[in-house]
């Protein structure tokens, strides 16, 4: 998780779009100058996460890495939790569970769980985990696999989608959905991500099929067609071409 989470953050949008927004939770306790210094640290975050993912595998470094990982999750909870942005309520228990797993798996392990490494290769579950957590996420770097299933967490590099509505379709929208639209003389735009975040307080799954389902739903809701509700899909940056 940490290895791919770090790799996914190696893009030009992470610091200005996500990291600066997250650390703004401290704007009441830090000065602008201090926030500026912390912002520069954001460029190190991808490599920091990648490193801790690797170093957790090395027993000799765990006494340093485990406290750093726990501190990272605590800071994330402070920034995104009720005391900070109060955003994405799903991620609050997720961070607590990650701390518990780190302590369970890597802290103060005095005896190896398996004396013979070949024991791992005898179970089907080992190959399932390797496939889901190591092989499939590689394809996400070329946008051929789901971002969230590849630890692309707060990476700022996600697919985007807008539904562009004619005046006819816009007028048929319920008032609660109009709140998630911007309007001007030329067109009306419904932001699916904003809609999901406001109603559920969790991010939208940023995949083509999800956006298409929302597109079809709006067409049915407004009793129009794809000419009245246009689908504008913006693919995320591919970190690797293959």
Question: How would you label these PLM feature ranges?
Answer:
Residues 84-101:
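Loop-to-transmembrane alpha-helix initiation sites
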Residues 60-62, 105-120:
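Membrane-interface junctions at the ends of membrane-embedded or membrane-associated helices
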Residues 27-41:
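Short aromatic-rich membrane-water interface segments that cap or initiate transmembrane helices
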Residues 8-13, 134-158:
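Hydrophobic alpha-helical transmembrane segments in integral membrane proteins
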Residues 117-143:
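Internal/C-terminal transmembrane anchor helices
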Residues 153-242:
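Extracytosolic and intramembrane catalytic regions of membrane-associated proteins
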Residues 1-10, 38-79, 102-105, 151:
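Functionalized membrane-embedded alpha-helices
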Residues 1-22, 144:
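Transmembrane alpha-helix/helix-exit interface in multi-pass inner-membrane proteins
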